[in-house]
């Protein structure tokens, strides 16, 4: 994009200070071309808008002790340019920056380095991959919103760089696909040899496990051979014994349950001893002898067991009925006993109140006696017994204490020895 087109399309914002050096850097033009285009644009816009211009003044200033003056460069406003030209010898002025007078935006930096011209003057070629490093002018873009042409060519470079990476990605899957069939070919050979190797590896492992768990495996295998269907009948009889008991039987005293269990065990032992003598066959011994007894009985005589089960059920049902009656009667007895136990405390409390009232009437409230020194002492009744009297009979106890306690009793009570008070307190606490 040319500078003239950018100015016509209002791509350059003059609210900020537009430096000529920026335009030289962006559009790669000579100073004369930029100056001519910019002055022509300002003349067109000047009747409507007022611009604030700055000029670069260059000249020589005389100093003491030197015939040739020093070079002086200064950026000056247009209003002060004539004064500076008069002060300096061989003065030259060039347009440096343009800005709309009274712009709302913050001012941009006045001085900026010109990398493009520095490279040209030093005759140094810039590295192709190096990007432009231009300081930002108060948060604004260095080119004043105008995009340079070389930046457009960057996407093409990146696309060219990405192409070899795509080809490498394509080549990698091809390699992986080529490796997969090789692995698949080798896998059947491994599968063919694997069962033999696994068998050879499994044998020592099994031997080790057998040495550790031989005891448990042997013990587990024997009961499996010995236990047959008749064992279910024995377990069923035990389960029926507990299942057929109603809810009331649980509440029956534990003594009746213990007696029934003992009777059942004794009857089983007697039957087993009778049936052991005629049995000619011998079965292999097992770890659990009690289970063996039940197995022999069930295997030899199944009909007799059924009869015995019927008898047991009848006995259990009769026991359950009696247990229910006993439980109901025991409940009633417990209720009556609890009522009897609750009543005596009430009677005892009433008796205690009557006894206390009698003591209050019979015994005097104050005791008068002579001390060892010959002083007359009146002992007042202890104050700790008053709350009990108030709880039992407040109306009867209060007036007795008020009537019989003279004012002198309080004074005398303080002088009484502690041993005598302790003896009286013990007397009332015991009763």
UniProtKB/Swiss-Prot annotation:
Start and end residues of each stretch annotated as Disordered: 128-431
Localization (cell): Nucleus; Nucleus, Nucleoplasm
Record's compositionally biased regions (Basic and acidic residues): 172-200, 252-271, 308-328, 343-362
Superkingdom of this protein's organism: Eukaryota
GO BP annotation list: DNA repair; DNA synthesis involved in double-strand break repair via homologous recombination; double-strand break repair via break-induced replication; double-strand break repair via homologous recombination; mitotic DNA replication; protein-containing complex localization
GO molecular function, one term: DNA polymerase processivity factor activity
Location of region: Necessary for function, possibly resulting from its inability to interact with PolD2: 64-80
One GO CC annotation: zeta DNA polymerase complex
Keywords, comma-separated and alphabetical: DNA damage, DNA repair, DNA replication, Nucleus
Tissue expression profile of the protein: Expressed in ovaries (at the protein level). Expressed in ovaries.
Chain intervals with Low complexity compositional bias: 156-171, 278-290, 387-411
Bias (Acidic residues) ranges: 294-307
Deletion consequences: Oocytes and embryos lacking maternal PolD3, show no nuclear localization of the delta complex members PolD1 and PolD2, resulting in limited genome replication during the earliest cell cycles and thus early developmental arrest. Mutants, presumably with maternal but not zygotic PolD3, develop normally however adults display a variable degree of bristle loss or shortening, and females are sterile while males are fertile. In larval salivary glands, the delta complex localizes normally to the nuclei and chromosomes display a significant decrease in homologous recombination repair.
Functional summary from the UniProt entry: Accessory component of the DNA polymerase delta complex and possibly the DNA polymerase zeta complex. As a component of the delta complex, participates in high fidelity genome replication, including lagging strand synthesis, DNA recombination and repair. Required to recruit the DNA polymerase delta complex to the nucleus of rapidly dividing embryonic cells, and as a consequence is essential for genome replication during the earliest cell cycles. Increases the efficiency and processivity of DNA synthesis of the DNA polymerases during mitotic DNA replication and repair.
Assembly notes: Component of both the DNA polymerase delta and DNA polymerase zeta complexes. The DNA polymerase delta complex consists of three subunits: the catalytic subunit PolD1 and two accessory subunits PolD2/Pol31 and PolD3/Pol32. Within the delta complex, interacts with both PolD1 and PolD2. Component of the DNA polymerase zeta complex consisting of four subunits: the catalytic subunit PolZ1 and three accessory subunits PolZ2/Rev7, PolD2/Pol31 and PolD3/Pol32.
Full protein name: DNA polymerase delta subunit 3
Gene name per UniProt: PolD3
